[in-house]
Amino acid sequence: MLDRDGFRPNVGIILLNQRNQVFWGKRIRTHSWQFPQGGIDRGESPEQAMFRELHEEVGLHPEHVRIVARTRDWLRYEVPDRFIRRDARGHYKGQKQIWYLLQLIGHDWDLNLRATDHPEFDAWRWHDYWVPLDVVVEFKRGVYEMALTELARYLPRQDFRNRFLRSNVRAREFERHMPDGGAPAGLDLPPGGSFDPHPDITSASDDPSPPPHNKAPFLPSQR
C-alpha cells in the first residue's frame, strides 16, 4: 500500500526504560541495529499498527507501556535504489512514518524477541537517547534525527545530560552538568539477553538484509 508519491505508511517505536535509555534491536542474522518499526496494514490506524508491531518485534502488550507522545506529521525517508527490488523501482520510493515515544512500565524480562514465529531481532540492548544517530544506517539517519528531536521535549528532566551530548557540548560545559565520576553511566544488561558489544554499522548494505518469512525491509508489500 503506497501513497501517490511512492511512500509506504509505517510506524516507528522509541521505547524508553526508567533511565530514559532507548531500546535498540539487532536485526536477525545481520549486524544492523535499529528501532522497532513496521508497515501499517490496510484498515489499521497508526496506533493499532504500533501496538501490533510492538508485540511482534519486542513481545510487549499495551499494558506494558505508556504512550508518551507521537510525531505530529509523517516523517519520510527514501530508500536507495540498490536496496529496492528491481520490479518495484520507479514507483516505490521509501517509507513515511509516524513515530511513537513509549515508556516501559513493565520490566526488562517482559521483553520477548520470540513472541512470534518470525522474529525481527535476535539481540537487544539499552542505549542513551541520542546514540542511535551515530550507528544507524546512513539513509535512515535523517528521519531518526527528526523523530528523536521532535520527541525529546517530552523526556523527563533526567535526560538533560544527553541533550548536551547531542548538541556537541564538550569538556567544561558538559562536565558542569555531569555527576562526579565523569563518564555517562554504563548500559544495563537485562537478564538472559544476548548482546553485541560493538553494534556499529559498517556499511549501508548491512541494514536491508531480509529476515525470514519474506518480511524483507524496504519493499512496497513488506516492512
UniProtKB/Swiss-Prot annotation:
Residues 180-193 have a biased composition (Low complexity). It comes from the Bacteria. PROSITE patterns: NUDIX (PS51462), NUDIX_BOX (PS00893). InterPro entries: Nudix_hydrolase (IPR020476), NUDIX_hydrolase-like_dom_sf (IPR015797), NUDIX_hydrolase_CS (IPR020084), NUDIX_hydrolase_dom (IPR000086), RppH (IPR022927). SUPFAM superfamilies: Nudix. The keyword Hydrolase applies. Its cofactor is a divalent metal cation. It is an enzyme of class 3 (hydrolase). Residues 175-223 are annotated as: Disordered. A motif (Nudix box) lies at residues 38-59. GO terms for molecular function: metal ion binding; pyrophosphatase activity. Residues 6-149 form the Nudix hydrolase domain. Keywords: Hydrolase, Metal-binding. The keyword Hydrolase applies. Its EC number is 3.6.1.-. HAMAP family: Nudix_RppH (MF_00298). Belongs to the Nudix hydrolase family. RppH subfamily. Accelerates the degradation of transcripts by removing pyrophosphate from the 5'-end of triphosphorylated RNA, leading to a more labile monophosphorylated state that can stimulate subsequent ribonuclease cleavage. This is RNA pyrophosphohydrolase. The gene is rppH.
